[in-house]
């Protein structure tokens, strides 16, 4: 995969990168990636694709064995209880629930991307894994499982969720930023033609590290364009940033004025009250 420079996204990111909201920073970024694979990407892709396919085949085999055993038990129960219609009904009802209940081995076979026995489903998941590794080079998402992702059912739900989250932190969001955000994304990725996924944060990833008070992330994937836009946003405590910079945690906690001075020294972004939209 390859990072795509976009002047429109750069303009949005200059505003989203470091929004001062008092004792914390709202740090968001929009990144565009091409799904065309280079030499090293192809090697990683083949390795992950083989691993996911083998895991899918293994779990599918386990499910077939389970279903076969259930069918055998069903026949045995019917034969042994042929003299009692009530027992037959009870046994059949119990088996029906058991057969229709999700198997713990089915997660890899039926995923947010579709059946993992399907190469297209595996390809989509691998794209998202590779993108996460590029976006967060200090972390490794290679071992991520299908259940760590979620497919969003509706573009409108995603838009409403992002608007609500950002409006809670950004002054005059609906007046100055909302229209620019969504018109830019529409021109970049054709939102109506996108599949939208999110990554579910787990311990040890950048969305759950110390100081992250809130986060969201969305992948807007346009198959026909072979392009993904990744929208990541984290609400990070200024105090944690101060500690990460090497300050002595035994010192008295800084007051708000000290936190603001530290922020102004290390970040070039404007505060909310001095927003500049190009």
From Swiss-Prot:
Q: Where in the cell is it found?
A: Nucleus; Cytoplasm
Supply one GO CC term from the record. cytoplasm
Q: Which GO terms describe its biological process?
A: negative regulation of transcription by RNA polymerase III
Biased composition, Low complexity: where in the chain? 64-101
GO MF terms here are: RNA polymerase III core binding
- Is ATP-binding one of the keywords UniProt gives this record? no
- Residue ranges, annotated region (Disordered): 59-114
Question: Would I find Cell membrane among this entry's keywords?
Answer: no
Where does the record place Polar residues bias?
Answer: 102-114
- Purpose of the protein: Element of the TORC1 signaling pathway that acts as a mediator of diverse signals and that represses RNA polymerase III transcription. Inhibits the de novo assembly of TFIIIB onto DNA.
Q: What family does this chain come from, according to its entry?
A: Belongs to the MAF1 family.
Name used for this protein in its record = Repressor of RNA polymerase III transcription
Query: Its encoding gene is what?
Result: maf1
């Amino acid at each position: 995969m390859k990072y795509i420079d976009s002047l429109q996204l750069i303009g949005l990111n200059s505003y989203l990168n470091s929004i001062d909201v008092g004792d914390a920073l709202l740090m968001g970024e929009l990144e565009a990636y091409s799904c065309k694979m280079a030499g090293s990407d192809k090697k990683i892709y083949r390795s992950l694709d083989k691993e996911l396919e083998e895991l899918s085949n293994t779990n599918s085999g386990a499910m077939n064995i389970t279903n076969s055993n259930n069918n055998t038990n069903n026949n045995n129960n019917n034969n042994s209880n042929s003299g009692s219609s009530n027992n037959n009904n009870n046994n059949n009802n119990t088996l029906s629930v058991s057969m229709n209940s999700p198997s713990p081995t089915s997660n890899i076979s039926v995923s947010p991307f579709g059946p993992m026995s399907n190469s297209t489903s595996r390809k989509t998941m691998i794209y998202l894994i590779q993108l996460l590794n590029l976006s967060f080079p200090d972390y490794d998402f290679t071992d991520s499982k299908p259940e760590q992702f979620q497919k969003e059912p509706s573009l409108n739900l995603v838009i409403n969720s992002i608007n609500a989250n950002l409006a809670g932190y950004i002054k005059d969001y609906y007046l100055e930023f909302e229209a620019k955000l969504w018109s830019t994304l529409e021109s970049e990725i054709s939102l109506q033609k996108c599949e939208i996924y999110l990554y579910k944060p787990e311990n040890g990833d950048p969305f759950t590290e110390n100081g992250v008070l809130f986060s969201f992330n969305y992948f807007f994937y346009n198959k026909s364009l072979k392009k993904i836009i990744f929208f990541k946003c984290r609400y990070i405590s200024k105090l944690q940033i101060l500690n990460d910079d090497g300050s002595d945690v035994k010192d008295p906690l800084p007051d708000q004025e000290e936190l603001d001075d530290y922020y102004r020294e290390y970040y070039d972004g404007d505060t909310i009250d001095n927003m500049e939209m190009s």
